[in-house]
Amino acid sequence: MKKIECVIMDWAGTAVDYGCFAPVAAFLKAFAEKGLTVTMEEARGPMGMTKIDHIRELFKLPSVTEQFKQNYNRNWTEEDVVSIYKEFEKHLFASLEEYTTPIPGVIEVIEKLKRDGIKIGSTTGYTTAMMNIVLPDRKS
């Protein structure tokens, strides 16, 4: 049997904020501010991507594309993606600290992995600035 050398953990939506409540709420608010309705199911669809790519994918949904055309009499552009991303970030940063509690057992698993000499890596769809809020003491 091979020895495990490294474990890669996903943070946002898995180790903390299981279920991705913080970004989903921020996506819904950011789109709503532009007069666009996105369902919770639709908002969850592209989870795992960078957040700007996630927003771009939501714009590609037929329902969102049609709403945008009806509201603005034009097709959406990359400028619209960036505009919603800025609103998304504002909402996410405002609520992120509420969703930083690790799921039960995560801290203990990390401590055991460290004791056993197993390297720990991480991945996330959050930016570095977002992770600095989620895991302010992540080095320890």
Where are these regions (language model features)?
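Conserved phosphate-coupling serine/threonine residues in phosphotransfer and NTP-handling enzymes
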Residues: 124-126
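N-terminal helical cap/lid subdomain that shapes the substrate entry/recognition surface
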Residues: 2-107, 111, 115-119, 129-132
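Conserved small/polar residues in nucleotide/adenosyl-binding loops
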Residues: 140
